[in-house]
Amino acid sequence: DTYDMPTEYGSEIYAGHQPAEDSACVTALRQAGAVILGKTTTTQFASPLPVGVRNPRDIDRTPGVSSSGSAAAVADFMVPLANGTQTGGSVILPAAFCGVVGYKASLDGLDRTGIVGLKNSLDTLGYFARSVEDIALVYGAVTGNSVPADDTKPRIGLCRTPIWDEAEDC
């Protein structure tokens, strides 16, 4: 939500809806010095139905799902950063489809107060940017924490399924 712009959740029943206050994520961004330039189109209540957003990399391809307007705006250089929410893929899919960096926080990794969600046990907040460095910058600005350095060696696990022997060698 933003106190100074309509928030319609992609639905006609919320046409002209004006929140009384910012959501926690918008408050944190403003406190960090961000200027909220506008809002992008979203699908109705985060449904997977298309809403007319075009993929700036290829207008004949989908830009993704409900947060696709945010990813497309970043990919098209309209904004350097955008918020998104995810219940089942609404940050990671548009980021991949539009060729930008998408960061989906863990369940309680970022404050979701003031965000209308679908399923509290699945809804998360995320960001879109054109670089990992920009994601780290916004994460640090809104949380007050730096992104921890990963000094662990990668671990790879294989799950042997009943059809394991049918897999081809690489």
PLM regions with names:
Residues 1-8, 35-42, 151:
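Conserved small-residue hinge/capping positions at short loops/turns
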Residues 17-23, 164-169:
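Active-site core of PLP-dependent enzymes with the aminotransferase class I/II
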Residues 3-4, 112-113, 167:
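Short helix/loop capping segments that flank catalytic or ligand/cofactor-binding pockets
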Residues 141-170:
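Gly/Ser-rich, acidic/histidine-flanked active-site/gating loops
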Residues 21-139:
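Short glycine/serine-rich loop segments
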Residues 5-9, 38, 119-120, 156-161:
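Short beta-strands and strand-loop turn motifs
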Residues 11-14, 56-59, 63, 162-166:
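Short, contiguous strand/loop micro-motifs
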Residues 1-22:
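Enzymes and membrane/adaptor proteins characterized by extended Gly/Ser/Thr/Asp/Glu-rich
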